[in-house]
C-alpha cells in the first residue's frame, strides 16, 4: 500500500510548478519496519524526490510520529498523509494553489472515496457524544434513528453539493497545511496516542485561520472505521474521545 501511495505522490508532484516543487518526503517508522521501508525508498531513487527515513524507535502514537516530520519541516507547505491514501494526479497542485492564493487559509481537506468508490466524509462539524459512540460501536439500529444528526456531523450536504466551504474539523489521513501554522500551534497534541489528535489539531488550526474543504482535491482512502479493528481500538477511541471533550467541551446530543 505504501508503494502505491508514494507512486501517487510522484505522479501528483509532476503537476506542481518548479518553484513549489516537493522538497522532501519523510517516512516515519512507528514500528520496526526499517528494512521494508528502505527497500521501498530505494525503488524510488530514480525519481528526483528527497525521501527521508526516520525511525521513531517505538510506537509513539499517530500524532507524535507525525510531529517528528512537522518539527523538521522548513517548507512552505506540509502534507500530513496516511500510507493508505492514494492521491489523484491534480490534487496536490489544487490544494497548494488554493493555499497560495488565500492568505487567511491555513489548511485544506479533500473529497474522498474508499477502495469501493463509497464516499468518505473527511470534513466534519463539532461531534456529539451520541453520534461518536453510535458510529464507533457500529450500532446500525440506533444509527437509522439519528441519521439526520450523523448527516449534519459528516457534512454530507456540503460534500454532495461539491462546493468549496469552510469547515471546523478535518481528517488526519490527509491534511495539507501551511507549515508556519502547524509550528504555531505546536503540531499534534501528544496527549492523544490514537484517535482525535486530528480533531484537536483542526480546532487549534481553526483558531488562527480558515480550514477549507476542496471538492476538486481528490483522494482514495483505504483505512478508517475503528469498530472493525477490535475492542482494543474501541477502548483507545473512547479514551481519546473523553480527553477531547474534557478539553473542548461536551456535546451530548
Where are these regions (language model features)?
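Conserved donor NDP-sugar-binding/catalytic core segment of glycosyltransferases
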Residues: 86-122
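Active-site-adjacent helix/loop segment of glycosyltransferases
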Residues: 199-203, 207-253
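Short, flexible, basic/aromatic active-site loop/helix in glycosyltransferases
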Residues: 127-167
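Glycine-rich, basic loop-to-helix element that forms the pyrophosphate-binding segment
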Residues: 55-73
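A short, conserved alpha-helix in the catalytic core of glycosyltransferases
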Residues: 159-162, 166-187, 191-218
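Short aromatic/hydrophobic "clamp" motif used to bind/position activated sugar donors
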Residues: 78
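Short, well-formed alpha-helical segments that are part of the catalytic scaffolds
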Residues: 1-17
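A conserved acidic beta->alpha catalytic loop
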Residues: 8, 26-38
Amino acid at each position: 500500500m505504501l508503494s502505491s501511495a508514494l507512486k501517487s505522490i510522484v505522479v501528483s508532484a509532476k503537476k506542481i510548478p518548479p518553484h513549489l516543487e516537493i522538497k522532501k518526503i519523510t517516512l516515519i517508522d512507528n514500528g520496526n519496519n526499517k528494512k521494508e521501508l528502505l527497500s521501498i525508498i530505494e525503488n524510488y531513487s530514480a525519481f528526483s524526490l528527497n525521501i527521508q527515513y526516520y525511525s521513531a524507535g517505538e510506537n509513539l502514537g499517530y500524532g507524535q510520529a507525525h510531529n517528528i516530520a512537522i518539527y523538521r519541516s522548513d517548507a512552505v507547505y506540509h502534507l500530513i498523509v496516511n500510507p493508505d491514501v492514494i492521491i489523484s494526479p491534480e490534487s496536490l497542485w489544487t490544494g497548494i494553489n488554493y493555499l497560495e492564493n488565500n492568505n487567511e487559509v491555513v489548511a485544506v481537506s479533500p473529497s474522498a472515496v474508499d477502495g469501493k468508490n463509497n464516499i468518505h466524509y473527511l470534513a466534519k462539524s463539532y461531534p456529539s457524544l451520541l453520534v461518536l459512540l453510535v458510529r464507533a460501536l457500529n450500532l446500525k439500529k440506533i444509527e437509522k434513528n439519528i441519521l439526520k444528526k450523523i448527516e449534519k456531523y459528516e457534512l454530507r450536504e456540503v460534500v454532495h453539493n461539491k462546493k468549496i466551504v469552510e469547515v471546523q474539523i478535518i481528517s488526519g489521513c490527509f491534511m495539507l497545511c501551511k507549515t508556519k501554522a502547524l509550528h504555531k500551534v505546536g503540531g499534534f497534541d501528544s496527549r492523544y496516542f490514537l484517535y482525535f489528535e486530528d480533531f484537536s489539531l483542526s480546532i487549534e488550526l481553526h483558531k488562527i485561520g480558515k480550514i477549507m474543504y476542496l471538492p476538486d482535491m481528490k483522494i482514495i482512502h483505504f483505512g478508517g472505521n475503528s469498530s472493525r479493528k477490535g475492542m482494543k481500538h474501541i477502548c483507545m477511541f473512547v479514551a481519546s474521545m473523553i480527553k477531547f471533550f474534557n478539553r473542548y467541551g461536551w456535546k451530548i446530543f
